[in-house]
Amino acid sequence: MKRTFQPSRIKRARRHGFRKRMSTAAGRRIVNSRRARGRKKLTA
């Protein structure tokens, strides 16, 4: 059986990237909460 995690930078960015987060209200809330916490990395 193959491993379930088959990394792809493009898929990762498209699903969890900054532009995807900013496209919805919930995503913007995620980014803002991470900013408030002082996260170095906001999105994938």
UniProtKB/Swiss-Prot annotation:
Gene3D superfamilies, alphabetized: 1.10.287.3980
Single Gene Ontology BP annotation: translation
UniProt entry keywords in alphabetical sequence: Ribonucleoprotein, Ribosomal protein
Residue ranges, annotated region (Disordered): 1-44
PROSITE patterns: RIBOSOMAL_L34
Compositional bias annotation for Basic residues: 1-22, 31-44
GO cellular component: ribonucleoprotein complex; ribosome
Pfam families referenced in this protein's UniProt entry, alphabetically: Ribosomal_L34
GO molecular function: structural constituent of ribosome
Family indicated by similarity: Belongs to the bacterial ribosomal protein bL34 family.
NCBIfam families, alphabetized: rpmH_bact
Protein name: Large ribosomal subunit protein bL34
The organism of origin for this protein: Desulforapulum autotrophicum (strain ATCC 43914 / DSM 3382 / VKM B-1955 / HRM2)
Gene label: rpmH
